Amino acid sequence: MILANDELKRLISLGRLKVEPLAPDTVRENGLDLRIGGEYAIYAYEGAVVKPCELDSARPLFRVVKADEVVIPPRNFVLLTTEEYVKMPDDVVGLANLRSTLARYGLVIPPTVVDAGFEGNITIEVVNESPNTIVLRRGMRFLHLILVKAEGRALYSGTYQGQRGVTPPKGLRGEC
């Protein structure tokens, strides 16, 4: 069941769902609109051979940029972080979607689940499929998070729990 505006506000008022900072236009009809944070990550090298199964961390492959503008080159991608620090209830799952206006410029994100019990800034991959450089601004609403009630409870305890700022991917050594 998708949670609507009144239920989202109720969960926030009870402290079960936390969104900090909480702007007046964050809670929407059927989800949360989240803003671009103050940093992003982009690959530091072009043409490198990346072998996730041999990495403990991919952080050295990325350059973290602190800026008020996010520059996304044509047919490239960046990792964006939300301005908001989110704490999900243990029985609610988030489904992340790019706001449709940005998709109309040629930006896309992969299907992304924010697990029940997750806490942290959300890092999301944004791909520019267009032939043009696209520049986004810090603080603009970019991510629409649909919240869905889960059957039962879960507690997320993964690598990205408690992340602050943009977080490059973990390595997959030992998982392949």
Curated annotation (Swiss-Prot):
GO molecular function: dCTP deaminase activity; nucleotide binding
Catalytic activity line of the entry: dCTP + H2O + H(+) = dUTP + NH4(+)
Disulphide-bridged cysteine pairs: none
Gene that specifies this protein: dcd
The enzyme's E.C. designation: 3.5.4.13
Database matches in NCBIfam families: dCTP_deam
Function: Catalyzes the deamination of dCTP to dUTP.
Residue positions of the active site: E125
Residues reported in the UniProt entry to bind dCTP: R99, S100, T101, L102, A103, R104, D115, Q163
Keyword Iron: no
Pathway of action: Pyrimidine metabolism; dUMP biosynthesis; dUMP from dCTP (dUTP route): step 1/2
Assembly mode: Homotrimer.
Classification via SUPFAM superfamilies: dUTPase-like
EC class name: hydrolase
GO BP: any one term: dUMP biosynthetic process
Pfam families, per the entry: DCD
InterPro entries: dCTP_deaminase, dUTPase-like_sf, dUTPase_trimeric
The family this protein is said to belong to: Belongs to the dCTP deaminase family.
Annotated PANTHER family: DCTP DEAMINASE (PTHR42680:SF3)
Entry keywords, A to Z: Hydrolase, Nucleotide metabolism, Nucleotide-binding
Protein's UniProt name: dCTP deaminase
